[in-house]
Amino acid sequence: MSGEKSSLLLIHPAVTTTPELVESVKKSNVFADSSKLDQFLVNKLNDSSVQLEDEKYSLVYYLTPEKESEIQFPTKLIAVLAQSLRGGGRLFGLSDVYKIDALINGFEVVNSGEQGYHWVKKGTAHTQTAPVALRPKRNTPSGGSKSLPIFAKPSFALPAFKKAEKPKPTGLPTFKKPESPRASVVAEDLDDGDELDGMNEDDSNSDELTASKSKFFDDVAGQDSADSIDEDDLVDDAEKSAITVVTCGKTKTRRRKACKDCTCGLKEAEAQEADAARAAQDRILGKPVKFDEQELTEIDFTIQGKKVGGCGSCSLGDAFRCSGCPYLGLPAFKPGQPISLDTIADDL
């Protein structure tokens, strides 16, 4: 069983349409020394429908119609094929596109030779034995009995820790009550008499300046108070309002409109003004509007010898008249016939 060489032929699904290609590959020199050949579709292996045994095959061949640079192969199957190959097993059919995956999974890439490009799994076939120097035996005592090794008893002394000293109690910080600003100023003045004299001189100068300023503004205020002018005198008579507001005699308030129960005469004055305005309107608008015969007659002179309506359809009736025709509501008439508008004079 150990001398039997098993091979695996993985077939691309597109190759099933050309069975003669599969037979020609089986008869090639690659499978010449194979005693057993297994044949599976690569998609069956990809979907785990077929499980491969570990280290069973010495040769795996992938048959695909694709070009070498366009091969599409599931990268996860490279590890599966590496596990199913024996040490020194060969894998044909893949290209340098998957070279990195081959190196990761323990393959060596072979580019030269009669068999062409293929991968070889690293294993016992390529390992070489190396001599190893053994440790010389120890001389035993004359008695020939082996003595047990003697081990010194370790000492597990616990580490000693020194008790930390307690910190000495410290009292609470004491705070000195601050002195009043006045007292500190007095103390400083007592200590430094020259500085006090300088400050007194500055204070006296500032007091004199303040007194002079107040005197100046008092003089200005006195002049303004002596020459004050009434604000009403600054308004010209022409700028005064021409509206006279009548004060109601009962409520003693200024009103533009008379009260409901006014007895001061404002209500009567307003009524008199309203009557005068109404009478003026009646005089202007009360005159009746009268039209002469020429104004009441609309004649079209576009057709000589024949008189028709102004719009050309006025004589046909309301169905044919425009919305602004003055003959709306009148019966139809003959073109050129004078029409009197006396019937609608009241509406005008």
From Swiss-Prot:
Protein's gene: DRE2
Gene Ontology cellular-component terms listed? mitochondrial intermembrane space
Region spans: Disordered:
128-148, 162-213
* List of residues binding [2Fe-2S] cluster: 248, 259, 262, 264
Q: One GO molecular function term?
A: 2 iron, 2 sulfur cluster binding
What spans are recorded as compositionally biased (Acidic residues)?
188-206
Region Fe-S binding site B, as annotated, extends over 311-325
Region span, Fe-S binding site A = 248-264
The function of this protein is: Component of the cytosolic iron-sulfur (Fe-S) protein assembly (CIA) machinery required for the maturation of extramitochondrial Fe-S proteins. Part of an electron transfer chain functioning in an early step of cytosolic Fe-S biogenesis, facilitating the de novo assembly of a [4Fe-4S] cluster on the scaffold complex CFD1-NBP35. Electrons are transferred to DRE2 from NADPH via the FAD- and FMN-containing protein TAH18.
Q: Which residues bind [4Fe-4S] cluster?
A: 311, 314, 322, 325
Q: What does the domain comment read?
A: The C-terminal domain binds 2 Fe-S clusters but is otherwise mostly in an intrinsically disordered conformation.
One GO biological process from the UniProt record? Answer: iron-sulfur cluster assembly
Name by which UniProt lists this protein: Fe-S cluster assembly protein DRE2
Cofactor field: [2Fe-2S] cluster; [4Fe-4S] cluster
Where does this one sit in the cell?
A: Cytoplasm; Mitochondrion intermembrane space
Renumbered to this chain, motif Cx2C motif 1 spans: 311-314
| Positions of the UniProt region annotated as Linker | 186-241
What family is it from?
Answer: Belongs to the anamorsin family.
